[in-house]
Amino acid sequence: MAKLHDYYKDEVVAKLMTEFNYNSVMQVPRVEKITLNMGVGEAIADKKLLDNAAADLTAISGQKPLITKARKSVAGFKIRQGYPIGCKVTLRGERMWEFFERLITIAVPRIRDFRGLSAKSFDGRGNYSMGVREQIIFPEIDYDKVDRVRGLDITITTTAKSDEEGRALLAAFDFPFRK
């Protein structure tokens, strides 16, 4: 079992119960899933780029990504409906906790010129989204084998009812928010 999951059960739940005066342990917000999304618009011209992006996402998450396809045709971007334009992975359970731990302890501190993550990136329902400009911050990616530096979106979906609860949940995990 991931250390962060044990930490959540033992300490975070108790801390949030007293902070928000919950009656039941089931009211305490928890991390439900983490979604990693990599948009590869250049895949229209070269299909190999999408394969490389999918391989990177597989290395980062430990799970095979789903290839996302264009929902509708856009002439300005030269894409047609059904063209593969990206890939995504949804992590839940044990893999999610292991990824979350690696994200907080290893990957985020390796971001260049890092001054903390914005606390304004909540969606109004306690879910947090962040963008990473380089996939090479993850130790699973071999810098020498990278064909192109590409970014990815990371969305942390929680059961929190408000941004305040979501922020308190992530702050309890020592999530590096900007002061």
From Swiss-Prot:
It holds the Pfam family Ribosomal_L5. The lineage of its organism: Bacteria, Pseudomonadati, Pseudomonadota, Gammaproteobacteria, Enterobacterales. GO terms for biological process: translation. It comes from the Bacteria. Keywords: Ribonucleoprotein, Ribosomal protein, RNA-binding, rRNA-binding, tRNA-binding. Part of the 50S ribosomal subunit; part of the 5S rRNA/L5/L18/L25 subcomplex. Contacts the 5S rRNA and the P site tRNA. Forms a bridge to the 30S subunit in the 70S ribosome. Transmembrane segments: none annotated. GO terms for cellular component: ribonucleoprotein complex; ribosome. It comes from Klebsiella pneumoniae (strain 342). GO terms for molecular function: rRNA binding; structural constituent of ribosome; tRNA binding. This is Large ribosomal subunit protein uL5.
